Swiss-Prot record:
GO BP: host-mediated regulation of intestinal microbiota composition; N-acylethanolamine metabolic process; N-acylphosphatidylethanolamine metabolic process; phospholipid catabolic process; positive regulation of brown fat cell differentiation; positive regulation of inflammatory response; temperature homeostasis
Source species taxonomy: Eukaryota, Metazoa, Chordata, Craniata, Vertebrata
Cofactor binding, per record: Binds 2 zinc divalent cations per subunit.
Gene3D superfamilies, alphabetized: Ribonuclease Z/Hydroxyacylglutathione hydrolase-like (3.60.15.10)
SUPFAM superfamilies cross-referenced by the UniProt entry: Metallo-hydrolase/oxidoreductase
Gene: NAPEPLD
Name listed for the protein in its UniProt record: N-acyl-phosphatidylethanolamine-hydrolyzing phospholipase D
Family: Belongs to the NAPE-PLD family.
Subunit description: Homodimer. Bile acids promote the assembly of inactive monomers into an active dimer and enable catalysis.
N-acetylmethionine carried by residues: M1
InterPro entries, per the entry: Metallo-B-lactamas, NAPE-PLD, RibonucZ/Hydroxyglut_hydro
Residues that hold an N-acyl-1,2-diacyl-sn-glycero-3-phosphoethanolamine according to the record: Y188, H321
Residue sites binding deoxycholate per the record: K256, M260, A348
Length: 393
């Protein structure tokens, strides 16, 4: 499939004082503490698109999707060229495999050594970071992937374009049985053609794909038949697991794969709402008011996967990619108890030093009165089990 992609870009909002952060955290904990409240939270058969105070997807006069918030700004071709030509690249990714193995080790995921342990069947939740925005989530008797990319390059061609400097921790053939895949948008580092083909070849119609509005035709051309295409605030489920609701929720970004298809496909985040756990996947996003809306409707979440990388230079990137401080604000806005860092340490997509995002994240957490366990960073291939049923969680 011959495809091409360019980059665009984005205003920081007001800061939260530490007291406000603690107040919102306490509110989130109090609203989801007891067993009875955890099970009573499953009441999602409302159509949130009918609510007056939710931000609905919007199209311009040309019929293409647009970001509906003042926090978005389109960049012209001269702005893109200035970034590509004039801005200094500080990423400094070493060519030495030994140095990379020391700084960013790639672990063998637990499910390769002990495949029989895959699948959390109790009330807990387990996540495994497979690099970039690819996360394997096990919760509420389901296993699903977010934005799977197992290829060496995030590009229409495996001979050019952004190349991984950290390999994927596993192959698709080594994955446990996957029930669903969540796609946030159609950029090459989030929607990888080769990974889609390989996942479909392995799992076929047993695998349900949840994709944004406008992507159904592309998925069907790849041979995928079990595809659910959703607008913001629409929901669906995996057959046989109707107690777990997948809601496509807003984010601030853009879409493009070819020269002429700008924003013909919607972009967004995902809220996964189960009887025991709630998971939020931010996808790729700039900071915007949508996250408070999501937290208001579906919070508190037990875990969120939030991007922390590809943010420099800010005057170009801020509209489409949050920096670590804005990632912490999303953590607060969606009312999540824990967050994990994604979208860093895999591809050099922007100009910050390749090891800077976790450092900036810890600095931001300290400013907001949070600790590293509230918003944690995993190694490639590393898993984290969260006992979400523990009253102290």
């Amino acid at each position: 499939m011959d495809e091409n992609e360019s980059n665009q870009s984005l205003m920081t909002s007001s800061q939260y004082p530490k007291e406000a952060v603690r107040k919102r955290q306490n509110s989130a904990r109090n609203s989801g503490g007891s067993d009875s409240s955890r099970f009573s939270r499953k009441s999602f058969k409302l159509d949130y698109r009918l609510e007056e105070d939710v931000t609905k997807s919007k199209k311009g006069k040309d019929g293409r999707f647009v970001n509906p918030w003042p926090t978005w700004k389109n960049h012209s071709i001269p702005h893109v060229l200035r970034w590509l030509i004039m801005e200094k690249d500080h990423s400094s990714v070493p060519s030495s495999k030994e140095e990379l193995d020391k700084e960013l080790p790639v672990l063998k995921p637990y499910f390769i050594t002990n495949p029989e342990e895959a699948g959390v069947r109790e009330t807990g939740l387990r996540v495994t970071w497979l690099g970039h925005a690819t996360v394997m989530v096990e919760m509420d008797e389901l296993i699903f992937l977010t934005d799977p990319i197992f290829s060496s390059r995030a590009s229409p061609s495996q001979y050019m374009g952004p190349k991984r400097f950290r390999r994927s921790p596993c192959t698709i053939s080594e994955l446990p049985p996957i029930d669903a895949v969540l796609i946030s948008h159609n950029h090459y580092d989030h929607l990888d053609y080769n990974s889609v083909i390989a996942l479909n070849e392995r799992f076929g119609n047993e695998l349900r794909w949840f994709v944004p509005l406008g992507l159904l035709d592309w998925m069907q051309k790849c041979g995928c038949e079990n595809v659910i295409e959703l607008d913001w605030w629409e929901e669906n489920c995996v057959p046989g697991h109707d107690k777990v609701t997948f809601v496509f929720t807003p984010s601030q970004h853009w879409c493009k794969r070819t020269l002429m298809d700008d924003n013909k496909v919607l972009w967004g985040s995902w809220s996964v709402l189960g009887p025991w756990n709630r998971f939020f996947f931010a996808g790729d996003t700039g900071y915007c008011p949508a996250f408070e809306e999501i937290g208001k409707r579906f919070g508190p979440f037990d875990l969120a996967a939030i991007p922390i990388g590809a943010y420099e230079p800010r005057r170009f990137m801020k509209y489409q990619h949050v920096d670590p401080e804005e990632a912490v604000r999303i953590h607060i806005d969606v009312q999540t108890k824990k967050s994990m860092a994604i979208h860093w340490g895999t591809f050099a997509l922007a100009n910050e030093h390749y090891l800077e995002p976790p450092v900036k994240l810890n600095e931001a957490l300290e400013r907001y009165g949070l600790n590293a366990e509230d918003f944690f960073v995993l190694k490639h291939g590393e898993s984290r089990y969260l006992n979400t049923d523990d009253e102290n969680f």
